[in-house]
Amino acid sequence: GVPCSCRGKSGTYWSAGKCPGEHYTTYCNNLIG
């Protein structure tokens, strides 16, 4: 899948899929352009 950046209270990290929990915001490269 497309690498996604997960942003949460613990910081920002990369994930290959959805972020764990609803307290994270997912940013995918295909959505950014």
Swiss-Prot record:
Q: Which cysteines are joined by disulfide bonds?
A: 6-28
Q: What is this protein called?
A: Toxin Bcg III 25.52
Q: What is its main location?
A: secreted
Please state where this protein is localized. Secreted; Nematocyst
| UniProt key word Hydrolase | no
Q: Which Gene3D superfamilies match?
A: Anthopleurin-A
Which InterPro entries does this chain map to? BDS_K_chnl_tox (IPR012414), Myo_ane_neurotoxin_sf (IPR023355)
One GO CC term, this protein: nematocyst
**Keyword set, alphabetical order:** Disulfide bond, Ion channel impairing toxin, Nematocyst, Secreted, Toxin
UniProt cross-references to Pfam families, sorted A to Z: Defensin_4
Molecular function terms, GO-annotated: ion channel inhibitor activity; toxin activity
Which source organism?
Answer: Bunodosoma cangicum (Sea anemone)
**Family statement drawn from the similarity comment of this UniProt entry:** Belongs to the sea anemone type 3 (BDS) potassium channel toxin family.
